[in-house]
Amino acid sequence: GPMGIMGPRRGPPGPPGKAGEDGHPGKPGRERGVVGPQGARGFPGTPGIPGFKGIRGHNGIDGIKGQPGAPGVKGEPGAPGENGTPGQAGARGIPGERGRVGAPGPAGARGSDGSVGPVGPAGPIGSAGPPGFPGAPGPKGEIGPVGNPGPAGPAGPRGEVGIPGVSGPVGPPGNPGANGIPGAKGAAGIPGVAGAPGIPGPRGIPGPVGAAGATGARGIVGEPGPAGTKGESGNKGEPGSAGPQGPPGPSGEEGKRGPNGEAGSAGPTGPPGIRGSRGIPGADGRAGVMGPPGSRGASGPAGVRGPNGDSGRPGEPGIMGPRGFPGSPGNVGPAGKEGPAGIPGIDGRPGPAGPAGARGEPGNIGFPGPKGPTGDPGKGPPGFQGIPGPAGTAGEAGKPGERGIPGEFGIPGPAGARGERGPPGESGAAGPAGPIGSRGPSGPPGPDGAKGEPGVVGAPGTAGPSGPSGIPGERGAAGIPGPKGEKGETGIRGAPGAVGAPGPAGANGDRGEAGPAGPAGPAGPRGSPGERGEVGPAGPNGFAGPAGAAGQPGAKGERKGPKGENGPVGPTGPVGSAGPAGPNGPPGPAGSRGDGGPPGATGFPGAAGRTGPPGPAGITGPPGPPGAAGKEGIRGDQGPVGRAGETGASGPPGFAGEKGPNGEAGTAGAPGIPGPQGIIGAPGIIGIPGSRGERGIPGVAGSVGEPGPIGIAGPPGARGPPGAVGSPGVNGAPGEAGRDGNPGNDGPPGRGYPGNSGPVGAAGAPGSPGPVGPTGKHGNRGEPGPVGSVGPAGAVGPRGPSGPQGIRGDKGEPGDKGPRGIPGIKGHNGIQGIPGIAGQHGDQGAPGSVGPAGPRGPAGPTGPAGKDGRIGHPGSVGPAGIRGSQGSQGPAGPPGPPGPPGPPGPS
């Protein structure tokens, strides 16, 4: 420590002081204290040697304070102690709040089509436009079936007339579009929030006729009725330019056969027409009204009626004809390839419940839900007690462990002390669904719908092989809708009481007979969500009972987090998108060709080519606007009941949405008297199935409603996949049947052991539903009692009214791809198209590059001798010659002449 008083005097090192309190001891100087080795410090300089460790008080006067010694080495950490024993598991923490529901996944596969809605009234017939100038021939529509000749009015906007406008060659039929997804029949109601598709319920009594919707997918094509007598042939109008395609007409019910036209005056007999290609299958719509016979020339013998062609683009809706008789059933065509997934259809009405699914794993226990009103005691004998599951393991102390799968319940031990609340554990996997408890009483039936006309009974066709499941079957014609019952006011829903912890569910009892379904009241406003109940394990679904008539769908219940109240209902949504289009559209109109000359005489129709194979499915277009409502057509006979689609597999259970407060209960309308069962019409010919769409991801399914009694059923729509069963809340004690009292607060949980199951008694007859009591007030939330053993399942009560449709579930995982459909029948070849307009001449091309020289030719023959040439120019001077050699000496010359005289001599 610092030096004591000793200060600088360096005493002999004292015995090592006891280590000073660890406190101020500076680093103990290195002096010999026990202190660990001094650091490098030499002797601490100034600091004297620590004296005896002085009294450890404050050190006396501090001598000069030594510099602190170097820090001693830190000792090693001690060994860790043993872990304590885990404490007891704390009491269950309050479950954390439920997470929010995630955003909806991608859209699920298209749900099954809803049932066919009532047929809307036919839209008003548009007036024919004035004859246009003859345009270039529009693309040829498919040749419709050869009907009675209509009036040859001016070619109005209706471009797709079967008879070609210009009497040119018959254009090839357009490729058949893929079958569209059937639109809703009639104006679609406002689509509820799309819940998972419910299991299609029984067909409800058809509602009133809605406005005409877009034309649905091909209905089942009926057999052609007998041809009326042929009217006079109309004169051929000038070809109009092709009008825009009208909105699809509503699918009417099949029309009755129209009256025969008057016989035209007999002209010379023309040659029999060539058999036309198949007409476009009508929607199961009403037949258009036959126009008056035109003045076409003398009628020839009627041509053979060709098979109906695949559907071309729909023309404007024709005037509805009187109702034809149902045709006999056709054969089932092979299934087409899968098409892409369609847009989800509007939710269909709930179908009959499917067979029970396997029991799922137990779900996590959620917060207790509100206590529901007491249901009637079930009538059936108690079921056998299920085997207890194994007990869960103890979690680590303190923290709540993740939730294990609930074990079997042991005999309850005495209650331990309540542990502190641990943080909420994560939810465990869902437990198996418990059995479904007995049904509550049904609401009173709604008022009777009007009775539909009975359809004629057609001969039943042979059933075709079932298509792969999942693809919705074709829709049959809708039965005649009864009027809607009056909506009662919605009662105020009390807030839900707290639910105790759920016990494991027992097995499902048998389904009782379904009572008649009343029409649904309007949905009440959405209440605020109650607390989330704990999810009990879902039990297996029972088998579906016979399908009852569907009530009008109630408002959708909340499915996801707390939702706001619903706003007012908006206008009718757009019609569902059309099905995938075939890739080849008909040729566009040719460019303008100048004014047309007067029309030529009508040629005989060319032979119909065979229909080409369907093109691949196009991408689904956006939904078109709803068509105008047509006038009300004559009500058609009820169409045949189609086969029920196969039950889809159940989707995984969705999380239960929080329970919103209930809307006010509406007063129930008086029950309608069910109309007599209509005679089932014969099945129409099944069109070529469209390509199979990719399998959509299964949506999370809503709960299955129970089927009501079977109404006048149209064919059931395809069955949607069943939704997952929601977890049952804890059941309250059974109240007396009839009107529900307010639920009392939950009593303390009972503790007895489960008794043995008694023998199974005979199932009691279903009681009649009592009137619906007012909703009780919210009870206080009881502490959750220990989970009791699963009691025997009660008998299934009478069918309750259909619940509101759930919100569209989250998108399920994509299902496996379905089996490949049967290849479609090969279509006929199309008719030869009109010759195209000649193209313009192209510009003259640039000169080509010079080619290589050709090989040398052989020598030519010798030519004739030439004429004499002109004289040439003088040649140039040649070079100097070589110098010659020296010549030899010549001969002596002759003597010379005499010389001149010499000068005179000297004197």
Swiss-Prot record:
Residue ranges annotated as compositionally biased, kind Pro residues, are 892-907
Q: Pfam families, per this entry?
A: Collagen (PF01391)
Amino acid composition bias (Basic and acidic residues), ranges on this chain: 19-33, 808-819
- Regions that span the bilayer: none
Q: Which residues carry this modification: Deamidated asparagine?
A: N260
* Function text: Type I collagen is a member of group I collagen (fibrillar forming collagen).
Coiled-coil segments: none
Could you give one GO CC term from the UniProt record?
Answer: collagen trimer
For this entry, the protein name equals Collagen alpha-2(I) chain
Main subcellular location: secreted
Q: How does it assemble?
A: Trimers of one alpha 2(I) and two alpha 1(I) chains. Interacts (via C-terminus) with TMEM131 (via PapD-L domain); the interaction is direct and is involved in assembly and TRAPPIII ER-to-Golgi transport complex-dependent secretion of collagen.
The answer to keyword Secreted applying to this record is yes
Which residue windows does the record flag with biased composition (Low complexity)?
A: 101-130, 155-169, 206-221, 272-281, 292-307, 340-362, 424-441, 453-475, 495-507, 535-555, 566-581, 601-611, 664-691, 706-745, 756-766, 783-804
Q: Which family does it belong to?
A: Belongs to the fibrillar collagen family.
Gene this protein is translated from: COL1A2
Q: Which portions of the sequence form the region Disordered?
A: 1-183, 199-907
Note, other: These protein fragments were extracted from fossils. The tryptic peptides required multiple purification steps in order to eliminate contaminants and to increase the concentration of peptidic material.
Sorted UniProt keywords: Calcium, Collagen, Extinct organism protein, Extracellular matrix, Hydroxylation, Repeat, Secreted
Q: Give the free-text PTM comment from the record.
A: Prolines at the third position of the tripeptide repeating unit (G-X-Y) are hydroxylated in some or all of the chains.
* 4-hydroxyproline: residues carrying this PTM: P272
Give residue spans, biased composition: Gly residues: 591-600
Q: Which organism is it from?
A: Macrauchenia sp
Tissue expression, as annotated, is: Forms the fibrils of tendon, ligaments and bones. In bones, the fibrils are mineralized with calcium hydroxyapatite.
Location in or out of the cell? Secreted; Secreted, Extracellular space; Secreted, Extracellular space, Extracellular matrix
